Amino acid sequence: MVVTSVVEKRLGALPVAAEFLRRLDVAGIVDEVCPGGASAYLTHGQVIEALVVNRLTSPAPLVRVGDWARTWAVEEVFGIEPALLNDDRLARALDAIAPELDRIAGTVGARAIAEFGIDVSRLHWDMTSMSVHGAFPAGDQDEQYPVIGYGHPKDRRVDLKQVQAGLAVSADGGIPVHARVFDGGAAEVSQVVGAMKDLQGMAGAREFLMVADSKPVSYTNVTALLAAGVDFIAPVPAAQVKDELYAALDLAQAQAVDWVPERDAGKPATERESYRVLEDTHTMAGRRKRDPVHRVRRILVHSTAVAAGQRRAREKRLARAREEMDRLAGAAGGRHYGTHQKITVRIGVIAAKRYVTSCLRWTITGGEGEPCALQWHFDQDVLAAEAAADGWWALLTSIPAEQAGPDQILVHYKGQGTVERRYHDFKGPLAVAPVFVQHNRRVAALIQVICLALLVFSLIERQVRRALGAEQTMIGLYPDNRRVRPTGRMIFYHLGELTLRIGNTTDPPTVQITRGVQLHLLDLLGTDITRTRWPQT
């Protein structure tokens, strides 16, 4: 009997990630920006690439990255011994890149644009927050780096401190070409000008359109954008446009927009969300008399889905308020609500809780020896005025009318969902939270590393879709073989099943491919899975 030693390791998407990291030259850029990190074994750039690949394949705390490297074919693909990826070495690499995060992000982003031919004529900017577990006392944090503190968390965990990140995502493939880490308490409205300057530096001579949420809509930000010659699109904060303006609009005069949301593509025309647009001018004045007055285009948008949602929400609020007011009317004059004051206080609570203050009318009779009674109703004129404003919202833009009509402005803005989807990937497959590191400089560095992983993740998704042609769909991703657009999550899921069978010196390693979709994805990506990250010596 012959006994042979065979070892199997997870191969997954390691060869694919290695190819994209090679084209981006992440290790080379890190080593150029942060020289002096070379040891007898690894450079800072190699360590950072290992962290990027860990996030792409099987995110783990720093102390467990070495264990991940042992079970995955990291040594075979990247030439890195697992024992070298201990938490001390990883922490030193994070400390080394922390002072140069913006420079690394900008250089890698510019490299991605040039190497992969990314169209950056339209960039979508947004910020998100990551809650952090731990005390992180202010006195123990280095103020040269983003400070972890309390803010306005997206996950509503106001009991936890946070750190924030901003992404600029291209309309072409949803590629996060620029990323930056911010203080946990930084106001989003104050970061717009800095983001614009970063994007200008990265884009160089290229002109680009900056699409964002409502944060750019301040006099200071609009002034800076106009002065820099950067066109923008952003929604107007709801408080800046009165419902009376919307209620006075004639929907019949609005222009229909030839655009259908992707989620409605397979629905009958009568069930799809539809949009109509009108246009006027929005005036913005500074606080000082000498400040110039800005007049920019305002696109008034009506959405049938938004209108239906607002109508349902109002009906729900009214129904609950009606139930509680009827109950109060029945209890008026009794032991708990025997006085005008008690009834009035309760009405105030109901009106505030159900958001019906503007339309609720009531009369209290009795008192002074007579039992109190309550009569109430909803003001139908107020409700009709609210209903007339349903579905309307507004966008501001500096794009000249001759370059884009109001319908085109709306279509451009609708791409904002791309950056939101990337944040979903950021917090989902790449597991940005929880962050198990000490010191705010390491937190910032690790988040920037995860942003690099998101860049590779997005480029792989874009490559597969582009290789599929105009339809950008394929079969084999789901058990029922329905035709769908591949997402990064699907791609990494299927490639994650690849294994590497390692024999003895006379038996070369063998890649175990178990499903046809794996071969199809590798073919679409044009990846040679036998090629290692670094030349063999």
Region spans (language model):
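Anion-binding and metal-coordination hotspots
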Residues: 1-18, 24-537
